[in-house]
């Protein structure tokens, strides 16, 4: 009898542990080629000490402060854009096209905190936001407030269409920055936004048990599957800041839908297969030919993290060769002691050549040449440093090697923590190692932390 009770106890503990792992921010508990899996998002509580204090500041101050900013139309249209797209009020889209994704990141942060403290006010706040997101989403699953608002203002009620995927891609002038149609301009950041919607929907379901936002994420992922099955090679280049690589793989883990895993593999296959790719966007050459870190550091690190997710599910050794080589290039030649990366404000690709002027490519907020690591003019965007942490977190899970945990810790204590003030209300976009008042030129971003940054991607990421 005692043996039976012991076996039941062990079985119960095993099931409990598996459930906790499957409720993590990422769920690699069933990933065939991962050696580790993290705990559930509500399974660990900071009770005291340095990180206990940071958690309290973030949960009590930062989340509400960000919401107040996004809910103040005179400062930011972050939430107002969703209200307009949902038909709650009328108006024009205002602000950068990636604000949707930034709000989804904030939503993911709120859900993560709610998983720990079960604050009912946070639950109401999330429900309020989710209601607008669901109303703003098109019937085919597409959601991008600049496009949806434009459609509404032209008298097109895309919310009312019943049949999935019967809407056509509006944009036809690929690369025209004045074109606002769906996927017309790769700099509209649609896939970036959709990727963060996926992650927010997953984390919200794991934290609350509700499926409202998750259902919207499923519809968006299905739309993306259809898009990449039918889109031209040119349109398929839409992968600016590819958070959707991570998002699609996590959706596969959350649903078991094999279409999502196939999509994640396809995203890597088509990368670099079109003309006029850029080092800045890591698509001048196919990913499997890349062995050095290049270009825009946020885009790069998001890409590397997403590819690590794909490796965890497929075990493709070529991808691990690329990731290992790129990681070594970053850590030994292109990273600061703080874990910060992306040293250049603006520059030219190291792979360009003055002997072939047509091949010289501009880069921005990017990795530079080996050891090109200035102190006073370092860009080191907070999102790039967080991306470095996301990349190393996934490499830790798939390899079990502690060197990746060391890098996560280095970033967290230094180049990520520097992005937010002690009171949790002000933020840095850039994180130079030295700030000087005597520079003979003016840098683009302020030298002091501010409550609102026009590129508000870093605060919710932090």
Labelled PLM ranges:
Residues 1-23:
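Bacterial Sec-dependent N-terminal signal peptides
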Residues 21-462:
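Glycan-recognition and catalytic cores of secretory/periplasmic carbohydrate-active enzymes
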């Amino acid at each position: 009898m005692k043996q039976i009770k012991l076996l039941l106890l062990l079985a119960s503990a095993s099931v409990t542990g598996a459930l906790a792992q499957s409720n993590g921010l990422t769920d690699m508990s069933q990933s065939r080629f991962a050696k580790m899996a993290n705990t559930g998002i509500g399974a660990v509580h900071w009770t005291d000490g340095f990180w206990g204090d940071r958690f309290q500041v973030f949960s009590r101050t930062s989340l509400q402060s960000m919401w107040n900013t996004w809910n103040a139309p005179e400062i930011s249209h972050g939430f107002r854009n969703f209200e307009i797209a949902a038909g709650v009020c009328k108006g024009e889209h205002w602000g950068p096209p990636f604000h949707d994704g930034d709000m989804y990141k904030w939503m993911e942060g709120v859900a993560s905190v709610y998983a720990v403290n079960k604050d009912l006010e946070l639950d109401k706040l999330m429900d309020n936001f989710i209601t607008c997101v669901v109303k703003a989403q098109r019937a085919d699953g597409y959601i991008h407030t600049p496009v949806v608002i434009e459609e509404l203002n032209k008298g097109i009620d895309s919310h009312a269409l019943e049949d999935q995927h019967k809407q056509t891609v509006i944009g036809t002038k690929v690369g025209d920055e004045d074109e606002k149609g769906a996927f017309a301009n790769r700099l509209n950041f649609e896939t970036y936004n959709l990727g963060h919607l996926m992650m927010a929907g997953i984390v919200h379901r794991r934290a609350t048990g509700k499926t409202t936002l998750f259902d919207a994420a499923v519809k968006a992922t299905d739309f993306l599957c259809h898009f990449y099955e039918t889109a031209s090679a040119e349109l398929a280049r839409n992968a600016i800041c590819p958070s959707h690589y991570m998002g699609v793989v996590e959706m596969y883990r959350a649903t078991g839908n094999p279409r999502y895993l196939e999509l994640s593999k396809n995203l890597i296959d088509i990368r670099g297969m079109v003309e006029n790719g850029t080092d800045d966007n890591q698509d001048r050459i196919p990913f499997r030919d890349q062995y050095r870190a290049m270009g825009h550091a946020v885009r790069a690190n998001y890409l590397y993290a997403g590819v690590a997710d794909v490796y965890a599910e497929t075990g493709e050794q070529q991808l691990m060769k690329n990731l290992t080589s790129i990681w070594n290039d970053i850590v030994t030649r292109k990273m600061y002691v703080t874990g910060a990366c992306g040293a250049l404000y603006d520059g030219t690709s190291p792979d360009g050549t003055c002997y072939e002027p047509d091949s010289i490519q501009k880069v921005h907020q990017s990795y530079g040449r080996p050891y090109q690591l200035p102190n006073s003019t370092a860009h080191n965007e907070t999102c790039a440093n967080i991306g470095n942490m996301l990349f190393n977190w996934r490499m830790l899970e798939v390899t079990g090697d502690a060197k990746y945990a060391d890098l996560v810790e280095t970033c967290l204590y230094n180049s990520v923590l520097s992005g937010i003030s002690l009171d949790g209300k002000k933020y840095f976009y850039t994180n130079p190692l030295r700030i000087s008042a005597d520079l003979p030129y003016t840098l683009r971003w302020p030298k002091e932390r501010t409550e609102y940054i026009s590129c508000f991607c870093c605060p919710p990421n932090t």
